[in-house]
Amino acid sequence: KNIAVYFRNPVALFSLEMSNVQLVNRWISNVCEIPSEKIKSGQLADYEWQQLDYKLRDLLDAPLYVDDTPSLSVFELRTKARRLVREHGVKIIIIDYLQLMNASGMSFGSRQEEVSTISRSLKGLAKELNIPIIALSQLNRGVENREGEEGKRPQLSDLRESGAIEQD
């Protein structure tokens, strides 16, 4: 969002976890620095209304393209990404989050193999389009149980259903 709002670089966000409405509510609260509960209630001070009006213009003018298709396949994403780059000059793609994607039409021995295939496909797409693709990922719960400050720092091996993501 910041890349689109403050630097005016076109960004595509594929949100498999949250709806457009949920994302927009979160962004408005973040950009305006006003708690979402306060915005929803409408109980804002005059200066907060002014801030909301001023900051919303930045958000509305941002070249941000959001797709909240649930259970998006890597093939559907590839088609949409190519179109967004061609038609809107998208400079970065963000996927929230990797493990909710699927590689429809293909059969796999395990979910780990499927996620690895999706990861490799995204890497190939990034090379083809010559833009970064950032795929968010969930972590295994083991991170929470490790001792000490350094122990809680996530490592590539902590990625859920990671398989070959470390190599991609």
Question: Language-model segments: which ranges?
Answer:
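Cytosolic-facing regulatory segments adjacent to core modules
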Residues: 2-89, 103
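Conserved ATPase-coupling elements of RecA-like P-loop NTPase cores
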Residues: 102-109
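Hydrophobic "anchor" residues on beta-strands that sit immediately upstream
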Residues: 92
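Conserved Walker B
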Residues: 98
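Phosphate-binding/switch region of NTP-binding enzymes
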Residues: 113-168
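Glycine-rich anion/phosphate-binding loops
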Residues: 75, 112-113
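Feature marks short, surface-exposed loop/turn motifs that line or immediately flank catalytic pockets
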Residues: 20, 101, 140-143
